[in-house]
Amino acid sequence: ITYPPLDKEGIGVESPCNVHLVVCGMTDMGYAMALTAAHIAHYPNFLTAKKKSKITFVDADAHKKMAEFRSKYRALFDLSYVLYHEYTAGRETNRQEFLPSKDFLDIEWEFCQVPDFDDTYWEILAMEQEDNTNEYLTMAICYDSQKLCQNVAFYLPEIFYEKNIPIFYRNTILYAYEKELLTSDKFNNIYPFG
């Protein structure tokens, strides 16, 4: 399997685009994906257009896990812009912003607490993507439950498939029905890993 890069064909100095990685599941695999992206997702248009790469975590227990993650990587988060959202019953119920002590990093972080199987965040993200041509969105579905990873990957709002947004989902066993789905035109943007 050939996985597409976060920056598609590349981001140059004059590019108006930025990378946005959404990591579903604050698990060991999710942390590894996010930290790897934080190491490599640096682009020259930050110097000219102040475009930052964004890494978003989505998890049912994001508030607690965010505190643990930020504590573990305190030096990084002291210098990073962080936004926290909480979604309940179809709407945003809590929003907190954490400003960096110095604003010179080209990575920003977002943590979204969303109940499992609640479509609120996906619908908001889908609406943001409808007219957005300047954000290169990639999704990494990293829950510990393989079934939950499959459900999220294959049941997102249609725009994720129509716009061919790369969706990586954690999968240790590829079943025949998944192989069939992955070869269809609709799901050719979904990539199993793990």
Residue ranges of each PLM-predicted region?
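Cytosolic regulatory regions of ion transport systems
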Residues: 1-194
